[in-house]
């Protein structure tokens, strides 16, 4: 029976051609940490990471490859982003369907003076974008919203959500 993988919001499978081979080659031929040694393999590893940062910056039209940070997974990435970016007095908007990887750090940040509001969703998983404008505040620093739900299959309207925040000093994830 053919296997059909439907949880790509969790992880990708099968991996793209060459991924397993590249990881194996790195483990077998290099296996060192970058910025931890003054020998050829360490320099090669550092160059590989720099090249990867540059490629990702170009792919996502980023301003500077030094802004690319690698983490183990999206949960860690969200924690680094939210806890590093938000300050006491900041406000965040999140969709009502956000994953615990977003909600847990935001709930923790409430004790540090960060507040958040949930943008309501209808029973079918669609986002109430008209309610979003009413929830925006002068101190809103971020809009955190999944793009596609692996629970109900809804694709949220990222472009539509971005319109009312364009030109404000905040980030949309």
Report each predicted region and the residues it spans.
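Pyridoxal 5′-phosphate
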Residues: 1-173
